[in-house]
């Protein structure tokens, strides 16, 4: 059975290059911590943190990462000291994404795997929003996602796109920026 | 002899460890208020894949593990895997007989086992070969150091997912991805006056999904020279004169002098890692030629002293092709095919007449052992993430392997290379040249609540050479309080008898009969506490080892019984031995680790300590005794400071091992003769504690972009290694020396190296 399944999967389109490198549970904890080091976080968020978990329709890797992040975030008591809700959403297009973020007052957008080709347009769509975008993959950050995670020598590494962070009114404190790899 | 002192030492060190734990928690509590330390603490979490074949943090893994980063290897002047283990890991230790390092864990080490009680993986590919079960943990490992991304050292029984040999644990060498090895790199390094190493490597990405990393290296070492005191080997049984101990030399019976030519090693090595989409290919090849100035394990007659053409040569190559896919959000599939080839030679020239009994010949004899093994296999694995959030995951896999082994011994005239006789010690016995090995495993993980994770699994291994073996593991991980985790682990592991143990024979060795796999069971409780950027681990363990394979010296009654059953070979000496399942070990102890960073993450430190009380019962000594070579207390400490990106990093590392008995301490030499004092030593030889310090400076060379340096100084305080040189009794079992001479230690070493990076 396994042989057959493995053979048929040769036709699968998912690429290992978009696999998660840092465990989702750890990504969730880092996300929650990093949010509290954003000087504008509470002003932007209000009384409750709303996180949108963006997945790609028909992409198993993406679907699983979104589901796992939802469970992981739900187990964390607070994000940036505030209560929080998480919601899964499938990506349609960049404009619709921006509309959803505005309408639902999303303060954190987590981008699951599968969007390497869409990150550029996504960046343009949310640039005018006060929003922390978080990428599940390291490759997203140089292309415009504000915060991401990489694995270097068996340890996780935080990546920050500072230019994009400024555009989206994210103001990380220097204490944590020195722990990150910064892209400008 | 009693070992009460050992129990007291465990108690004292336990009190010390608890004290350190208390101090560290207190210090950490103060550190938690520093800004950014909570993020730093998360970034310092090790990410591991070895313990459960899945991506997880070290804290969540169902085993105690150490992750050693490439940065650590560079900061602390590490040159080989055994150095990394000694200076940087928890619970594992090596000992150096100047040939291949012995490796042990948690107070247990089996001398001369070729590393076959610990499983070595390179990118998940098992390296231990079937003839001896051997793997190289020193310079002969076969991976250029600069290519290593990190090392995962998992301690405790690990057969649940990996099968044979994972008794001490599993070491996984993970090589770099292209993004972390980008460009082309050239390295030259020398241990001044003793060795040099050159290496080159490259890492390139082709588009978004394809990448290639490769590295080649060459290491050459000669010396230092060591001086050995006189070892009296007595009178030659054949010539009646004193034994000749040098190549065509005088008959003095004395083995001694300064060895200038017989301590060397040469290691060409190459690794390649290629991935494209879901496909990953790993290739590796290495040869390892080495010579030691003395024999660490007893030979009745010594090889010729300082003879440069006595050497061992191993050659190995492997290929591993893996394909992974996630067809649905629930299911992951992985298929892997692999193949390995290994061959070994041991060349050994002896001028003593009693080891060269061939009528009419006066030339020295050249003993030539050769062995080859090849194996190919496939592993299929499915992972079912039932709820898609990793809270309930079933891992199922099967590994089918076909193994072929051949070995033989020849004796030649050392001058003419003419063969004296037909090959002996031929493996395999009979026509069955191929072994089929099947392993199947199942692992279930369940996280019923965020604060508790359960892991249960078992693997069955079957082969025609032994009865099926089941290796279970149960682990519970409880996030007991803020930053605190408690792990409870029960695990079993086994080691299949090597082909050499099962089938070898010679004039001093009777072929084994019905060897069973060695077994170990272990229970472990571990507490991990994170507070700010500091982390503390404290774990206690107990393990039971049974059916360990060792050499049994035949008794007079056994000779009589063999003769009566007409099973006595025509050529068998009266001190012959036979591999049997005769040894058991019972041990308990603790592991402790305290690590973290301070001064704004510029200073990094770690302290690892292990203490154990180990009781070994074997055929030779009878009553329980500590295992030879194995320190019952050992550990390491390190601290490094980074002055800034363009400035040096200074690292100081220390490795400590406690007092321990030397190899062969508890062996008897004539158990069948009652009126002789059966032990080789009038007083059991214990080696004094050893402390080794290493200071390393590394950083970029100013003004020359891309060029970096590393320099280290290493000093060992003791000049004794836990191995015996020569023999304290002569060829006629007459004790000639009241004390043992210990093997020497290369006490002072200095290394300098340069690396140039051609960045893309």
Sequence positions of predicted segments:
Chain A
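Short hydrophobic alpha-helices and adjacent helix-cap/hinge residues
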Residues: 2-184
């Amino acid at each position: 059975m396994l042989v057959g399944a493995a053979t048929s999967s040769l036709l699968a389109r998912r690429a290992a290059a978009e696999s998660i490198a840092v465990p989702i549970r750890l990504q969730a904890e880092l996300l929650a911590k990093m949010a509290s080091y954003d000087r504008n976080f509470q002003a932007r968020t209000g009384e409750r943190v709303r996180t949108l978990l963006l997945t790609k329709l028909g992409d198993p890797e993406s679907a699983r990462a979104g589901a796992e992040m939802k469970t992981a975030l739900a187990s964390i008591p607070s994000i940036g000291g505030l209560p929080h809700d998480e919601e899964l959403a499938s990506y349609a297009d960049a404009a619709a994404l921006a509309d959803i973020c505005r309408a639902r007052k999303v303060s954190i957008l987590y981008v699951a795997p599968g969007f390497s080709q869409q990150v550029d347009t996504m960046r343009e769509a949310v640039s005018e929003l006060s929003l922390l975008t978080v990428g599940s993959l390291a490759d997203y950050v140089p292309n415009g996602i504000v915060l991401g995670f990489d694995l270097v020598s068996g340890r996780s590494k935080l990546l920050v796109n500072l230019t994009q962070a400024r555009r989206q009114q994210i103001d990380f404190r220097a204490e944590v920026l020195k722990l990150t790899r910064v892209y400008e | 002899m009693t070992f009460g002192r050992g129990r007291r030492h465990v108690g004292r060190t336990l009190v010390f460890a608890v004290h350190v734990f208390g101090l560290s928690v207190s210090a950490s509590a103060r550190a938690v208020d520093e800004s950014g330390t909570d993020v730093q603490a998360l970034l310092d979490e090790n990410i591991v894949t070895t313990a459960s074949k899945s991506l997880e943090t070290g804290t969540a893994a169902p085993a105690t593990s150490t992750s050693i980063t490439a940065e650590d290897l560079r900061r602390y002047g590490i040159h080989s895997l055994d150095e990394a283990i000694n200076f940087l890991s928890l619970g594992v230790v090596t000992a150096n007989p100047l040939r291949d390092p012995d490796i042990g864990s948690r107070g247990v080490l089996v001398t001369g086992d070729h590393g076959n009680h610990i499983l070595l993986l390179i990118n998940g590919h098992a390296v231990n070969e079937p003839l001896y079960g051997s793997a190289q943990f020193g310079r002969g490992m076969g991976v250029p150091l600069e290519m290593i991304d990190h090392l995962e050292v998992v301690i405790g029984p690990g057969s649940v997912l990996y099968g044979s040999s994972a008794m001490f644990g599993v070491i996984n060498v993970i090589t770099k991805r292209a993004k972390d090895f980008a460009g082309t790199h050239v390295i030259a390094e020398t241990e001044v006056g003793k060795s040099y190493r050159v290496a080159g490597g490259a890492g390139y990405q082709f588009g978004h999904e394809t990448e290639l990393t490769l590295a080649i290296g060459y290491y050459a070492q000669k010396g230092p020279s060591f001086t050995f005191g006189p070892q009296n080997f007595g009178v030659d049984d054949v010539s009646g004169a004193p034994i000749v101990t040098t190549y065509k030399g005088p008959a003095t019976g004395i083995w001694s002098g300064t060895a200038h030519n017989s301590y060397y090693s040469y290691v060409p090595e190459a690794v390649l890692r290629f991935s494209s989409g879901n496909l990953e290919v790993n290739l590796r090849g290495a040869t390892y030629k080495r010579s030691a100035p003395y024999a660490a394990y007893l030979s009745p007659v010594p090889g010729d002293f300082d003879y440069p053409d006595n050497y061992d040569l191993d050659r190995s190559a492997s290929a591993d092709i893996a394909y992974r896919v996630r067809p649905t959000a629930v299911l992951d599939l992985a298929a892997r095919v692999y193949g390995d080839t290994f061959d070994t030679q041991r060349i050994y020239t002896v001028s003593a007449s009693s080891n060269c009994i061939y009528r009419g010949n006066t030339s020295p004899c050249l003993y030539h052992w050769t062995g080859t093994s090849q194996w190919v296999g496939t592993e299929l694995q499915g992972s079912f993430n039932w709820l898609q959030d990793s809270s309930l995951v079933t891992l199922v896999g099967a590994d089918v392997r076909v193994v072929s082994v051949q070995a033989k011994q020849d004796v030649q005239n050392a001058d003419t290379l003419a063969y004296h006789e037909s090959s002996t010690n031929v493996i395999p016995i009979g026509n069955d040249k191929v072994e089929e090995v099947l392993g199947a495993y199942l692992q279930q993980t369940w996280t019923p609540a965020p604060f508790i994770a359960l892991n249960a699994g078992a693997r069955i291994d079957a082969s025609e050479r032994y009865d099926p073996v089941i290796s279970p593991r149960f682990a519970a991980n409880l996030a007991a309080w803020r930053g605190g985790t408690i792990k409870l682990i029960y695990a079993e592991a086994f080691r299949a008898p090597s082909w050499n143990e099962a089938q070898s024979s010679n004039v001093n060795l009777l072929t084994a009969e019905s060897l069973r796999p060695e077994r170990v069971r272990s229970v472990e409780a571990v507490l991990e506490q994170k507070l700010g950027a500091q982390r503390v681990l404290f774990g206690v363990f107990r393990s039971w080892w049974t059916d360990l394979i060792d050499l049994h010296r035949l008794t007079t009654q056994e000779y009589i019984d063999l003769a009566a059953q007409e099973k006595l070979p025509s050529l068998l000496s009266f001190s012959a031995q036979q591999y049997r399942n005769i040894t058991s070990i019972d041990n308990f102890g603790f592991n402790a680790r305290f690590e973290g960073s301070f001064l704004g993450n510029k200073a990094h430190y770690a302290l690892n300590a292990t203490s154990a009380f180990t009781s070994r019962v074997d055929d030779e000594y009878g009553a329980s005794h500590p295992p030879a070579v194995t320190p019952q207390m050992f550990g390491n400490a390190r601290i490094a400071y980074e002055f800034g990106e363009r400035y040096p990093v200074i690292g100081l590392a220390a490795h400590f091992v406690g007092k321990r008995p030397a190899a062969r301490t508890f062996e008897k030499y004539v158990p069948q003769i009652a009126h002789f004092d059966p032990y080789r030593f009038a007083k059991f030889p214990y080696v004094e504690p050893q402390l080794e310090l290493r200071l390393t400076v590394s950083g970029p060379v100013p003004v020359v972009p891309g060029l970096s340096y590393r320099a280290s100084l290493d000093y060992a305080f003791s000049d004794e290694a836990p191995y015996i040189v020569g023999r304290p009794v002569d060829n006629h079992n007459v004790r000639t020396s009241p004390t043992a001479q210990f093997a020497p230690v290369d006490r002072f070493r200095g290394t300098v190296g340069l690396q140039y990076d051609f960045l893309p």
